[in-house]
Amino acid sequence: MASLLHKFLENASGKKGQDLASTAYLAALDHLLHSFPSIGKSVIDELKSQRSRLKMIASENYSSISVQLAMGNLLTDKYCEGSPFKRFYSCCENVDAIEWECAETAKELFGAESAFVQPHSGADANLLAIMAIITQKIQGPAVKRLGYKTINDLTDKEYAELKAEIGSHVCLGPSLNSGGHLTHGNVRLNVMSKLMRCLPYEVSKKTELFDYAEIARLVRTHKPTVLIAGYSSYSRRLNFSILKQIADDCGAVLWVDMAHFAGLVAGGVFVEEENPIPFADIVTTTTHKTLRGPRGGLMLSTKEYEGMINRACPLMMGGPLPHVIAAKAIALKEALTVDFKKYAHQVVDNARTLAEHFQKHGLRLLTGGTDNHMLIIDLTSLGIPGNVAEDILSSVGIAVNRNTIPSDSEGVWRTSGIRLGTPALTSLGMGSDEMEEVANIIVKVLRNITLRRNADDNFSKSEGELPENIAQEAKARVADLLARFPLYPEIDLETLV
């Protein structure tokens, strides 16, 4: 039986545009399929799955084949605890070169004073941020006040008192229902809430926007050590100049989590006061989402925090992932291009177009629209919870995620909303015409969902139904869009048997 690679090369023979990247990609799949069939099949099935759905989960995107290839090599075998040129292991010169180049590229891309590229995820970056702030602003001064050089010099009693002092300091951040992330400290199940006294600020009940005057009032009242700004489900931009002034007025550290909108900063969409880099003390982000890189984290900071962040090992990290850092470097270089800037602007244009068509059809959007890459539909008037809408849309080939809304009566599992994003569809090349078609499909599906009745004749809050004719029409329209805008068109699915 001919291998995948052989079939691919036969089909590609004589065709223009054949490149090494797609050949290498197929060679890797070919090897996995023959040597470890179950794993290889699952990888291929995932490729087929992603090519059969409109990916509209706001936190997901598509990375380039170059980014993916960078992670599949012997860099994964190298331990390199520490920072470039200051490792706890020998023979790290090649990893040093890659990490240094990655950090320098990040500084160039974002105009930052310092960059740290080791975090394995956005959650790791956020944990490192709070640990660096605690160490710099609370622990360090306390050790010095007691007349010691390091924390290891403290007695057990003094150390216990220091931990209690740290726990009394306030961290003020956006609540989960107002668009914050669980790592912003206001979810008690998360480790962040166990480090400091974490308090939330909310969006306005009237406008569903963050109220800077209210945030300033809370800051004056609670005098936080840390003010967190950022979001995972908020469809507007933030004014970081105002937030910096609010933080400075009480001496708080301004930490911005831009995991969702880093690509819009890199692409020059968010500028001046909407760009957090000139205002924040520490900025954290993921490298996937709107940046289109590998799954991972990244930190940017002022020089004040550079030394502490670079001591992530032993502060909270062990060995970094050099193969992922190599992929981050490639993604950051891709983000420096003119094409990426065009992409970033199109992401926002597409989100606005999508929002306009939803509103034209009478759907209610949180905040009344969007000016970033995402939007949140309030399903309350339709009488269906977010989990049901998510499942039904998935069944017709549209991937979205359920999402809480302010004062959500359905809770975090069912929710009263769904969140949609345009980064992935924009990566496929879709524009305003396609956004209109997508909106029309989604509206028709949502308006035809009914809740199933349980055995006791009550409506289910976990299962819904869609008329078969509506479902088939939606599937056909989704398939047409995907056929016109295929994922990785250079990878011929006909060879993946």
UniProtKB/Swiss-Prot annotation:
It is found in: Cytoplasm. Its EC number is 2.1.2.1. Its cofactor is pyridoxal 5'-phosphate. PROSITE patterns: SHMT. GO terms for molecular function: glycine hydroxymethyltransferase activity; pyridoxal phosphate binding. It is an enzyme of class 2 (transferase). InterPro entries: PyrdxlP-dep_Trfase, PyrdxlP-dep_Trfase_major, PyrdxlP-dep_Trfase_small, Ser_HO-MeTrfase, Ser_HO-MeTrfase-like, Ser_HO-MeTrfase_PLP_BS, SHMT-like_dom. It catalyses: (6R)-5,10-methylene-5,6,7,8-tetrahydrofolate + glycine + H2O = (6S)-5,6,7,8-tetrahydrofolate + L-serine. Belongs to the SHMT family. Catalyzes the reversible interconversion of serine and glycine with tetrahydrofolate (THF) serving as the one-carbon carrier. This reaction serves as the major source of one-carbon groups required for the biosynthesis of purines, thymidylate, methionine, and other important biomolecules. Also exhibits THF-independent aldolase activity toward beta-hydroxyamino acids, producing glycine and aldehydes, via a retro-aldol mechanism. The modification N6-(pyridoxal phosphate)lysine is found at residue 289. It holds the Pfam family SHMT. (6S)-5,6,7,8-tetrahydrofolate binds at residues 176, 180-182. One of its GO terms (biological process) is glycine biosynthetic process from serine. HAMAP family: SHMT (MF_00051). This is Serine hydroxymethyltransferase. SUPFAM superfamilies: PLP-dependent transferases. It comes from Chlamydia felis (strain Fe/C-56). The keyword Glycoprotein does not apply. Pathway: One-carbon metabolism; tetrahydrofolate interconversion; Amino-acid biosynthesis; glycine biosynthesis; glycine from L-serine: step 1/1. Homodimer. The record marks 288 as: Plays an important role in substrate specificity.
